[in-house]
Regions:
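Transmembrane helices with small-residue packing motifs
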Residues: 15-16, 23-57, 119-128, 380, ...
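Signature of alpha-helical transmembrane segments and their immediate interfacial
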Residues: 1-37, 433, 499-548, 665
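Helix-loop junctions and hydrophobic alpha-helical segments within the transmembrane domains
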Residues: 323, 330, 334, 409, ...
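Extracytoplasmic/periplasmic membrane-proximal domains and adjacent transmembrane bundles
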Residues: 9, 51, 122, 168-346, ...
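Solvent-exposed, non-transmembrane alpha-helical starts
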Residues: 19, 58-65, 102-112, 142-146, ...
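Transmembrane alpha-helices and their membrane-interface boundaries in multi-pass membrane transporters
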Residues: 398-412, 434-453, 460-499, 618, ...
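Solvent-exposed, membrane-proximal periplasmic/extracellular interface segments of envelope transport
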Residues: 4-6, 61-137, 195-216, 237, ...
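Hydrophobic transmembrane alpha-helices and their membrane-interface caps
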Residues: 30-34, 346-413, 471, 867-954, ...
Length: 1016
């Protein structure tokens, strides 16, 4: 750089530099302790859920009359990606998914549009439809969950204590929302004997009317006086069971109380709904979500204090136990990564001391905390929390941030060895290194551009990677210009009179010979390198594919599905049997069970499933990750042996966006029947793949149904109709809700049913008396033909088409992503080609998300390439030099792919990011070498000598910085998330650096026709 020499300025104004060093370290430490803490970075879940219920309707009916019109209306949503729906008897759940390109700032606007679209369609839905309801807070995370348990305490008693605790926790700092789980709703049942009802000359509808009138909340008006308004309140609402029993009933001239002719009881709703257990004990859960921008560790401490207060006030025998403790998990995660960061700092410092010597090592050791603290200040300013991505990125950048400092320090050391004084050495280092270092830093940062500017959920998840590493690299360049010269001026020592050539030792002589050989046989070197590169690229199909690996968290998510139509009672019994098997297993730390429902989203990387009576879920927490896999396998084996009709699936928490199964393929078609037929054929082919396990479809078998064909003429003659018959059957078989009882903050339904009717058997259905009007009862078999059939009880759709997902798990050494690709491209290729028009088989789940993410990641690559070439052009000023430096970029792939292949590590998102970044780092080294050649030519050296001496002069700093970078990645190897990146970086950078130092001189000499001496 011409003009002002910033290194000289910094040395002449040392006090200013020292002031900023102290200020940055102080500000960095303050920022570190005030940064937000989380296990994973936040990302936007672009999904809203629309639900509706239509009691009594079949899955086919509700699909045609409710799901289909709602889906068609929702197709008008701006930025819509796809719509997926789950329709079951009497209810539908519609998932509206927006494109990843929709900015998160516009998400709430889209949800408002969805509300308007649904409201527009509401009036067109059949009468009796409840809803639609919209949940646009599907991404709320309940990281702290507590269970209230206690033998001898009823659900209602536990609910009341939980409700009190909920109110108090709502006021705790950083708490956004508190929800109760596993609450069993109460219901008041008014049961009458059918014969007694008939003896009074009463019909069920008479009782309905009386209960509805007495239970209705109606305003009684307001009295307006000159001074005030006085409201009139009418007492006598049905707020207790006793008030119901005392309800007067008049039949003709007779008068009596409801309790005289009916049994009135308040009990838990039958059947039960959404049960929760903790360690096998019935529980009421308290789920707490953190406010946006909150600190998990602060929240954890605040909750711990409040819960301790609550425990002291609970009666003996009632306990509060922690089910999920995200603050503790975050604390452990931050501790582990902070430990890895410190290990990386120690490793890099040790390498610096060994390679540069004690005093030069001191300079580098002092530069590291300055840059790290400056990075913490930047993170605090930008609102980037400490989590797996940001801390991992700091470790990644640690090796890179010392590169510029190493180059400056090494150059100062060389100049001092050549006899310059300290100020002149600093000036020379700045003059020779500042501009190429800046270009190299910008190019290295540009290599990470695809991560920072890609669209999509995955890119959002790791988006902090680019911003942290780019800022750290730029800050490291600033430090190398201002801090390194000042500290080098102060600390670097060379013995008096000591002058030694940079090429004195044996390593340099060997390297000198290698360079000379490469220049002599430059065409062979170039062709050989190209062949090695091509051969390595050909290895890619043989490298395992896995976009995001499983985490090391100890949780096992166990989903158990019984045959469609199974009652919640049966599901409860199965889940209780599984819990019994876990008692006494020392591999189990704790387990929570959810019957008829799913666990709440206790971490962002967990997707709750839709409620279903035949579904149970257990969150098993293993003692540690070492016993996790054996616990999972043994539990699945127990279920398969003891409950052969149940379909169990265990999954682990991933380190990226989640999927229900590791292997998923979806088949969509025109109609339900053919779609199901083709899906069964595809599932059979998938099952034949070697090592496939647990192959299933999300489309259950048909369930039994009783179909009544009413004789309309006969019923009308008897004074009845379809509605009255359906209602009478509902009263007898299930109980009919007729009113509500207002009890504090609880709204308790009042249902009427006939005594003993809930025990009706299928065999007795034809003789069941039904009311047909005028007080007459006739056997059901006299007015209806009764048939027993099977029908589809569940229909999945995607973008208006019936869709069946084929799921499974991979066995053996291959990753799930690799298996899906082989299934799709080979096993199912012929099947796909022969599908009729309108039927498609596509990848689903994690592999589909990964392919989308790769596309998003590839989109900014042209911009990255352009920026790198532009920086090269400005720095090297010649197109041939730009091309030479540019084509060395892909050399990093050689070592990266070989490393992944040899270590059996998967190629996934982070390893792809690593390969993109490697290109920038390799080009950076080429710039430094080519710039040195240009300087030597400007000093009057012959072309051959300029190339040889430049390569030898830059050999030490380039290799030293590369080795330091590699050592900085070592602490990342234990992390499943970062391991593929670390492996690809270590292998790629080492090999690319070695090859680059030999190939760049060969390319330069080949293009510029530089020849060496005839005899070497």
């Amino acid at each position: 750089m011409k003009g002002l020499n910033l290194a000289e300025w910094a040395i002449r104004h040392k006090q200013i530099v020292y002031f900023f060093i102290i200020a940055i370290i102080t500000g960095g430490l303050w920022s570190y302790f005030h940064l937000g803490r989380s296990e994973d970075p936040d990302f936007t879940i672009r999904q809203a859920v629309v639900t509706a219920a239509w009691p009594g309707a079949s899955a086919q009916q509700i699909t045609q009359q409710v799901t289909d019109p709602l889906e068609k209306k929702l197709q008008d949503t701006k930025g819509l990606d796809y719509i997926k729906s789950f329709t079951h008897d009497g209810k539908t759940v519609i998932y509206v998914n927006l494109k990843d390109s929709v900015p998160k700032e516009e998400i709430q606007t889209r949800w408002h549009e969805i509300r308007n679209l649904v409201n527009d369609e509401w009036g067109s839905l059949p009468s009796g439809v409840m809803g639609p309801y919209i949940n646009d807070r599907f991404d709320d995370v309940y990281g702290s969950i507590y269970a209230i348990t206690g033998d001898g305490f009823s659900y209602e008693e536990k609910r009341k204590y939980a409700e009190n605790i909920r109110r108090r926790l709502t006021g705790v700092e950083d708490v956004q929302k508190v929800e109760l789980l596993g609450v069993q709703k109460q219901e008041i049942y008014v049961e009458m004997d059918q014969n007694k009802l008939a003896s009074f000359g009463m019909r069920p509808s008479d009782v309905f009317a009386m209960l509805q009138q007495q239970g209705a909340m109606m305003p009684a008006g307001m009295i307006h006086t000159d001074s005030r308004n006085v409201a009139v309140r009418v007492e006598g609402l049905l707020d207790t069971v006793e008030s119901l029993k005392e309800l007067p009933i008049h039949v003709g001239e007779r008068s009596f109380h409801l309790g005289d002719v009916a049994t009135v009881t308040q009990m838990y709703a039958d059947p039960e709904t959404s049960l929760m257990y903790f360690n096998g004990k019935p529980a009421v859960g308290i789920a707490v979500s953190m406010a946006p921008g909150g600190n998990n560790l602060v929240l954890g401490k605040n909750l711990e204090k409040e819960i301790e207060k609550e425990k002291a006030e609970l009666p003996a025998g009632l306990d509060i136990e922690q089910v999920a403790d995200q603050p503790s998990v975050v604390n452990d995660s931050i501790h582990e990564f902070t430990k890895s960061l410190l290990e990386a700092i120690v490793i890099v410092m040790a390498a610096s001391f060994l390679s540069l010597g004690f005093w030069s090592g001191i300079v580098l050791a002092l530069c590291i905390p300055v840059v790290v603290c400056a990075s913490f200040i930047y993170m605090k300013w930008q609102g980037i929390d400490l989590h797996i991505v940001s801390l991992g990125t700091l470790i990644v950048s640690l090796g890179l941030l010392v590169d510029d400092a190493i180059i400056v320090i090494e150059m100062m050391q060389v100049k001092l060895e050549e006899g310059m004084d300290r100020l002149a050495a600093a000036q020379a280092a700045y003059k020779g290194c500042a501009k190429p270092m800046l270009a190299g830093t910008l190019i290295t940062a540009a290599g990470f551009i695809p991560v920072g500017f890609a669209a999509g959920q995955t890119a959002e998840y790791v988006g902090a990677f680019f911003w942290v590493i780019a800022s750290t690299l730029l800050l490291s360049w600033v430090a190398s210009i201002f801090v390194s010269p000042v500290l080098g001026y102060r600390f670097i020592r060379v013995k008096a009179g000591e002058k030694k050539s940079a090429f004195a030792d044996r390593a340099y002589r060997l390297f000198y010979k290698a360079i000379a050989w490469c220049i002599r046989f430059k065409k062979t070197v170039i062709i050989g390198t190209a062949a090695i590169f091509a051969g390595t690229v050909a290895l890619i199909p043989f490298v395992n594919q896995e976009f995001f690996p499983d985490s090391v968290r100890p949780e096992i998510i166990l989903d158990v599905n019984l045959p469609s139509g199974a009652s919640i009672k049966e599901t409860k019994e199965v889940m209780a049997g599984i819990a019994d098997n876990l008692y006494g297993d020392n591999r189990v730390s704790s387990f929570s069970t959810y019957v008829g429902d799913s666990a709440p989203r206790f971490i962002l990387l967990f997707d709750p499933l839709a409620p279903e009576d035949s579904h149970g879920q257990m969150i098993l927490v293993a003692r540690d990750s070492k016993v996790r896999d054996s616990l999972r396998d043994d539990t699945l084996a127990f279920i398969a042996e003891q409950y052969p009709d149940a379909r169990a699936h265990a999954r682990l928490i991933t380190t990226g966006p989640p999927a229900e199964y590791p292997i998923m393929l979806r088949l969509s078609g025109k109609n339900v029947e053919d779609t199901a037929k083709f899906a069964k054929e595809a599932a059979a082919l998938v099952s034949q793949y070697p090592g496939m396990k647990n192959v299933s479809m999300d489309w259950p078998e048909e369930t039994p149904v009783v179909r009544l064909k009413i004789d309309q003429d006969k019923v009308r003659k008897l004074g009845g109709d379809n509605y009255s018959i359906s209602r009478d059957l509902y009263v007898k078989l299930s109980g009919y809700k007729v009113a509500e009882s207002y009890q504090g903050n609880q709204l308790v339904p009042i249902s009427f049913r006939l005594e003993g009717s809930n025990a009706a058997r299928l065999a007795d259905l034809s003789s069941l008396p039904v009311h047909v009007g005028n007080g007459r009862y006739v056997p059901l078999g006299e007015i209806a033909d009764i048939s027993y059939e099977n029908e589809t009880s569940t229909i999945w759709r995607r973008d208006l088409h019936p869709t069946i997902t084929i799921r499974g798990e991979a066995g053996g050494d291959k990753t799930a992503d690799s298996v899906v690709n082989e299934l799709y491209d080979r096993t199912l290729k012929e099947f796909r080609e022969h599908l009729p028009d309108g039927y498609t088989l596509e990848k689903d789940g994690a592999i589909e998300n990964s392919e989308k993410s790769v596309q998003y990641l590839a989109a900014p690559v042209p911009i990255m390439i352009f920026l790198i070439l532009m920086i090269l052009m400005f720095e090297l000023d010649k197109i041939p030099l730009m091309v030479i430096a540019g084509i060395t970029g892909p050399l990093g792939l050689i070592g990266a792919i070989l490393s992944l292949f040899l270590t059996r590590q998967p190629m996934g998102f982070v390893s792809i990011v690593g390969m993109l970044a490697l290109s920038g780092m390799v080009v950076r080294n080429s710039i430094i070498l080519l710039d040195q050649i240009r300087q030597h030519l400007a000093d009057g050296k012959k072309p051959y000598d300029a190339v040889i001496e430049s390569a030898a002069l830059r050999f030490r700093p380039i290799m030293l910085s590369s080795v330091t970078d590699v050592l900085g990645f070592v602490p990342l190897i234990p992390s499943p998330f970062w391991r593929p990146l670390a492996v690809s970086f270590i292998g790629g950078l080492l090999l690319a650096t070695a090859i680059g130092l030999l190939v760049v001189p060969a390319l330069y000499c080949w293009y510029y026709k530089v020849e060496g001496p005839k005899a070497s």
